[in-house]
């Protein structure tokens, strides 16, 4: 493949048409921002499963991140608003089913490249977040020979409302879980199209943090993602336990959705789909924040993650799992239990980590989500007074994460310094700066 001048990127064909990426801020990396992976879920497609993306004419230059899905957001003045969302506000829309790809520039248009692929699912309690948050960037991943994909998926009432009338219009008699269906659709899009970016469709690692990690647990449990996942990283999403998921069934989810919509006078599908998105978000923020999340519908999710793990129904993948130091009280035991199951039942032990760095600048410690600055190597975007030791730690974290994506093992080839967590040796890799740094 002939090298192209800086500022140029080859056009490639993906589902829907021709696209062209743009140079990233890092040399020798190309980024594709805002690629549609499904039709906009608007109008009659509100509360329907993702539909195939429409075709476009000409070349779509993927130079702009998309709108984000409707969400309450994290206001400046709150902890997470101050930490991650202080810089800019992003336009919200129901037309939000887009993904972003970072790849080495010389890999674009080379299906024989077979580079490993990381598929990132953001967190946010299933009602916040998007794929181009300030922490999230794929430059450092691509420089290490890994293609990074980040996605948006429907959230809150838009993504997880179940309702008897929605189920009645669906041939299989189920509703809800639209946000998880979006994730599966995006994963299938990546499998079908990533070779055009130089990626290996048979070497995809799914990873996520918090509700994104709970989403990864759903993806590795779902029969609909069978054969699409080689490796999985579960960050601060618990292990064996109910963190971030619901064991409720279809009928219970429908009853919750109907009761909520009836309360506000929306009693039929026509009325429900006519409600302005702003109004739906308003009532969701007022009384629905903890009501809508994935549930067991018998099709996408046929059993809980816990049962899938115990029944050996999880994706046949390598697993890395962990949390931050401040997460460890609620999550540590759950994570240990998952690792023990992997060793005792599957004889394929997982790799466990603990992120213990207490971030500089405040006394907030190693809080939930603290590792994001490090795993994307975006410390220079943070307002915190990051030190040289923090940058070295970010290098270490990134090396381990990208090694796992490449090899299913966080160690460099020939090294076993990070040992798997087994019954006989329950090893946990700790990430921190050295004492005194």
How would you describe each model-predicted region?
Residues 79-266, 309-332, 342, 347-348:
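Serine-hydrolase-like catalytic core of hydrolytic proteins
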Residues 154-157, 207-211, 353-362, 416-423:
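Short, solvent-exposed turn/loop segments enriched in Gly/Ser/Thr/Pro and often Arg
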């Amino acid at each position: 493949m002939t090298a192209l001048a800086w500022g140029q990127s080859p056009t490639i064909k993906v589902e829907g048409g021709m696209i062209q990426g743009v140079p990233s801020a890092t040399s020798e990396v190309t980024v594709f921002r805002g690629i549609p992976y499904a039709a906009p879920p608007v109008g009659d497609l509100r509360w329907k499963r993702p539909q195939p993306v429409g075709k476009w004419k000409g070349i779509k230059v993927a130079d702009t991140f998309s709108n984000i899905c409707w969400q309450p957001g994290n206001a400046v003045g709150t902890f997470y608003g101050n930490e991650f969302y202080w810089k800019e506000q992003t336009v919200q829309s129901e037309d939000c089913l887009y993904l972003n790809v970072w790849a080495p520039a010389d890999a674009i248009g080379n299906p024989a490249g077979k580079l490993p692929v990381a598929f990132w699912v953001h967190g946010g309690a299933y009602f916040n977040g998007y794929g181009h948050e300030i922490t999230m960037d794929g430059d450092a991943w691509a420089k290490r020979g890994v293609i990074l994909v980040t996605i948006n998926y429907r959230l809150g009432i838009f993504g997880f409302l179940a309702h008897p009338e929605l189920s009645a219009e669906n041939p299989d008699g189920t509703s809800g879980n639209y946000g998880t269906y979006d994730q599966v659709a995006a994963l299938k899009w990546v499998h079908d199209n990533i070779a055009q970016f130089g990626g290996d469709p048979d070497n995809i690692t799914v990873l996520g943090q918090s509700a994104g990690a709970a989403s990864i647990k759903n993806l590795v449990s779902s029969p609909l993602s069978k054969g699409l996942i080689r490796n999985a990283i579960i960050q601060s999403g618990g292990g064996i336990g109910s963190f971030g998921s619901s064991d409720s069934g279809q009928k219970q989810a429908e009853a919750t959705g109907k009761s909520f919509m009836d309360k506000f006078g929306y009693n039929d599908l026509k009325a429900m789909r006519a409600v302005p998105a702003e109004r739906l978000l308003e009532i969701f923020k007022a009384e629905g924040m903890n009501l809508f999340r994935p549930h067991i519908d018998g099709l996408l999710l046929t059993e809980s993650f816990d049962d899938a793990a115990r029944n050996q129904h999880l994706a046949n993948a390598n697993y890395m799992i962990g949390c931050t130091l401040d997460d460890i009280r609620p999550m540590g035991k759950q994570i240990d239990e998952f690792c023990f199951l992997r060793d005792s039942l599957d004889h394929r032990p997982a790799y466990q980590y603990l992120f213990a760095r207490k971030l500089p600048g405040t006394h907030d410690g190693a809080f939930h989500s603290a590792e994001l600055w490090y795993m994307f190597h975006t410390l220079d975007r943070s307002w915190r007074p990051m030190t040289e030791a923090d940058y070295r730690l970010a290098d270490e974290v990134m090396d381990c994460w990208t090694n796992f994506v490449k090899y299913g093992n966080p160690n460099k080839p020939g090294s076993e310094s990070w040992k798997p967590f087994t019954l006989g040796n329950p090893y946990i890799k700790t990430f921190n700066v050295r004492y005194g740094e």
